[in-house]
């Protein structure tokens, strides 16, 4: 099992390359600090104890290790007990949708994957390994991840563009007996649902009573639609650049929620985004910055809830959000109500690994959303506090416990662990 170094050692005389920055981004001093934090990479592998004698060497490598190898060959489940497999997650990307920057390729994605690995270790005690694949072919990605899967207890897919991500995740989960999660989809959806539970409490409404507009029907948007429908949302409208492309009878949408990528009318909009906003109570943006205006908000019902999650510029600027919305949230850490999938995936994988879960199912996601919402106590729930902070020490243990219990309740744990 590896450990990840959480300290960053900078040389006394730091000489960093000059990097041209687009206008309006970080100052030179901030850029220097950023590159200094990344110098030499942000993670490392270290042994759990020193190899400081011939006797220790013979235990951890030959000849002693041969006994462990034979034990695993006779009973593969032993790998979870005598190797780091049961505490290891592969963080896999093809670099096709890196952050909000687009298709940068696998090498440029590596710093982001290292950051994920640090967060896994710090927040959940999980050893996570960045795997940046030099292919964007779904078949090759599935073959490669399947081939390396014996080393890991879980697969975390990251920054893979839609619609390929849906097929890749499904095929990997079908092929493997360990949990697979595309975080851009399900991590986002879980935290959005948790925040919405509490925002609705603030406004005195119920999920089955409100009209919800999801703007942006990529990986995150479709997963949000699916989980909202599973949670009991009744009136749901989906928009992309073309306009209103997802609407229909509530029961029909709910039954077909797993098929949403196939039934969205991307090329045949039935209205505009403004049409979708008429009378809506909730706007969930997972799209692009500055697409909402005060005039748009006037089309919504009173006390609108707006989750403007585009980064770095939200769909509605904060100064307008606080003025015109009853509840306003972003994906940014410099404003209240940060909706961040960091609240979901460390605890979900911790619970999945601890319970021996073979998948992350819808029941787990719904349970985690409820648990996250309940971590905001009634006495502190307000327009400006609808979701726990990402460093709240209660989050990961509560989420892990919920996932472990849901795995047992739904019968998706490895044989012998029920």
Regions from the PLM with identified roles:
Residues 2-180, 405-406, 410, 414:
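N-terminal ligand-binding/catalytic initiation module
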Residues 99, 104-124, 182, 186-284, ...:
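Glycine-rich phosphate/diphosphate-binding loop of Rossmann-like nucleotide-binding domains
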Residues 94-96, 104, 133-134, 159-162, ...:
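Short, ordered loop/turn segments at secondary-structure junctions
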């Amino acid at each position: 099992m590896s450990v990840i170094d959480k300290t960053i050692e900078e040389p006394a005389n730091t000489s960093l390359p000059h990097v041209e920055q687009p206008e309006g981004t970080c100052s030179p001093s901030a850029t220097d600090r950023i590159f200094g934090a990344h110098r030499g990479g942000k993670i490392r592998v270290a042994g759990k104890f020193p190899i400081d004698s011939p006797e220790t060497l013979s235990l951890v490598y030959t000849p002693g290790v041969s006994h462990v190898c034979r034990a695993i060959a006779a009973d593969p489940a032993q790998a979870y007990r005598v190797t780091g497999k049961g505490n290891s997650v592969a963080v896999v990307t093809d670099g096709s949708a890196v952050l909000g920057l687009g298709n940068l390729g696998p090498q440029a994605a590596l710093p982001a994957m290292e950051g994920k690995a640090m967060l896994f270790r710090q927040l959940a005690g999980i050893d996570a390994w960045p795997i940046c694949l030099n292919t964007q072919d779904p078949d090759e990605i599935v073959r490669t991840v399947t081939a390396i899967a014996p080393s890991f207890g879980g697969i975390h897919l990251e920054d893979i563009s839609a619609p390929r991500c849906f097929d890749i995740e499904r095929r990997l989960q079908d092929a493997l007996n360990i949990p697979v999660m595309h975080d851009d989809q399900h991590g986002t959806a879980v935290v959005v649902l948790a925040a919405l539970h509490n925002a609705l409490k603030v406004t005195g409404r119920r999920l089955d009573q409100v009209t919800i507009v999801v703007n942006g029907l990529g990986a995150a948007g479709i997963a949000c639609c699916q989980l909202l429908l599973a949670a009991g949302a009744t009136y749901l409208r989906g928009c992309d650049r073309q306009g209103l492309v997802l609407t229909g009878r509530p029961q029909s949408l709910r039954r077909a929620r797993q098929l949403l990528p196939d039934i969205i009318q991307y090329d045949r909009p039935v209205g505009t985004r403004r049409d979708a906003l008429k009378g809506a109570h909730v706007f969930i943006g997972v799209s692009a910055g500055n697409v909402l205006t005060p005039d748009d908000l006037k089309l919504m019902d009173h006390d609108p809830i707006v989750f403007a999650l585009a980064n770095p510029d939200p769909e509605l600027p904060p100064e307008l959000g606080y003025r015109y919305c009853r509840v306003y949230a972003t994906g940014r850490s410099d404003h209240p109500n940060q909706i961040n999938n960091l609240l979901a995936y460390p605890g979900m994988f911790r619970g999945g690994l601890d319970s021996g879960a073979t998948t992350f199912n819808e029941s787990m996601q719904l349970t985690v959303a409820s648990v996250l919402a309940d971590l905001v106590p009634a006495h502190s729930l307000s327009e400006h506090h609808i979701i726990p902070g990402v460093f709240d020490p209660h989050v990961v243990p509560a989420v892990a416990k919920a996932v472990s219990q849901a795995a047992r309740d739904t019968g998706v744990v490895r044989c012998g662990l029920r």
